[in-house]
């Protein structure tokens, strides 16, 4: 019996977030592609305006916990003020937005603190 697209979709829909993330990484490595969204080129005026305007607000996104999960949870609690359960949930469900609308200085400091704890972080 051949595997159908529906079988594949059913299997994927039953994966956990972590398993799905690992699957995407394996696809990226095997096929040499990126899961990043495709950027559509804007007009010349829009590109020049975007380059002149520096971003002032950042979202802190935890992309990977790393090996030191407990240290990362402690860092998340210190940065966000979340309780232990909420911080643990945020760390286990990567990628997750930890804090939105941060200024550049605070965002860079938070990123450095999380990276020191062993996490991988992006500022968006």
Swiss-Prot record:
> What are the disulphide bonds in this sequence?
none
Which spans does this entry mark as compositional bias, Basic and acidic residues?
Answer: 101-114
Functional summary from the UniProt entry: Forms part of the ribosomal stalk which helps the ribosome interact with GTP-bound translation factors. Is thus essential for accurate translation.
User: What is this protein's record name?
Assistant: Large ribosomal subunit protein bL12
Mind telling me which SUPFAM superfamilies this protein's record contains?
ClpS-like, Ribosomal protein L7/12, oligomerisation (N-terminal) domain
> Its GO CC terms?
cytosolic large ribosomal subunit
Q: Which InterPro entries match?
A: Ribosomal_bL12, Ribosomal_bL12_C, Ribosomal_bL12_C/ClpS-like, Ribosomal_bL12_oligo, Ribosomal_bL12_oligo_N_sf
What is the protein's species of origin?
A: Campylobacter hominis (strain ATCC BAA-381 / DSM 21671 / CCUG 45161 / LMG 19568 / NCTC 13146 / CH001A)
Q: How does the record describe its quaternary structure? A: Homodimer. Part of the ribosomal stalk of the 50S ribosomal subunit. Forms a multimeric L10(L12)X complex, where L10 forms an elongated spine to which 2 to 4 L12 dimers bind in a sequential fashion. Binds GTP-bound translation factors.
Q: Which GO terms describe its biological process?
A: translation
